[in-house]
A protein has these predicted regions:
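Active-site and adjacent substrate-binding regions of carbohydrate-active enzymes
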Residues: 1-250
Length: 250
């Protein structure tokens, strides 16, 4: 992006727009959705620097702690609202805010930004829906409804792995237990049910709903059908299945 090119060259807009971090610090608390190194070394006009990459080294994280970044992003959203969009999706928004000695997921500052965007939509374009994409355990996912002041729509991420488990094992006990335990969506909000996506079937939403053994059996079965498994790094360095990349037809 032009912002990142300017960041490397020490120019504006872009300087200060991306998160720089000291590789000697301890980042073991940071929740990862990938196995790639968290930091990527880049050469800037000031010399070598390490930038934060939640997902991959070709996706460098913006520094929302810099007010200029937030203002620029709000301008982008305003542009789309001017163009007449009816739905705004915040992709992987759970990882938006970073701070020391924190998991860097679901930070209160992240929820504050979501509330700010919701306020912009409600005031400037009433009727425009805000949807959060948070591929995380069920209760964490529900937190993005806020107090009816964050997302209008939350993806029902737990449905996909539980449905796959039911189809492969012939028992719907976990699926039914989860369905019966789900609270109604808050007023003026709703759930979005889906069975799979271009990202695959997320496994984090099965945490607490399927046992570790059941999750392992599901992963092993998917691999036996030729499916590919995306993994994430855990704090101790071990890896765990993150997404099952296979279609229900396979």
């Amino acid at each position: 992006s032009n912002w990142f090119k300017n960041f490397l060259d020490g120019k504006s807009p872009g300087e200060g727009f991306f998160i720089e971090a000291d590789p000697s610090n301890d980042y073991s608390q940071v929740v990862r959705p990938r196995t790639s190194p968290l930091l990527a070394e880049v050469e800037t006009q000031r010399g070598p620097s390490h930038v934060w990459c939640t997902f991959s080294h070709d996706q460098v994280d913006l520094n929302f702690a810099d007010p200029r970044v937030l203002i620029e992003i709000l301008k982008v959203i305003r542009h789309y609202l001017d163009a007449g969009i009816s739905i705004l999706r915040l992709d992987a928004v759970a990882y938006l805010w970073k701070k020391p000695d924190h998991s860097c997921i679901h930070a209160e500052e992240t929820h504050a930004v979501v509330r700010l965007i919701r306020l912009l939509l409600d005031q400037f374009a009433p009727g425009t829906l805000l949807i959060t994409e948070t591929n995380v355990p069920n209760q964490e996912n529900l937190s993005y409804f806020g107090n009816c002041n964050e997302a209008h729509v939350v993806y029902n991420f737990s449905l996909a792995p539980l449905l796959a488990h039911a189809l492969l094992t012939g028992t719907s006990c976990h699926l039914k237990t989860w369905m019966m335990s789900m609270p109604p969506a808050p007023p003026s909000c709703t759930y979005l049910n889906f069975t799979a996506s271009h990202d695959g079937i997320g496994m984090r939403p099965a945490e607490g709903l399927l046992s570790d053994e059941e999750q392992h059996e599901l992963v092993t079965t998917i691999e036996s059908f030729g499916g590919k498994i995306s993994r994430r790094s855990l704090p101790g360095g071990e890896e765990k299945a993150y997404e099952l990349n296979i279609s229900l037809f396979d």
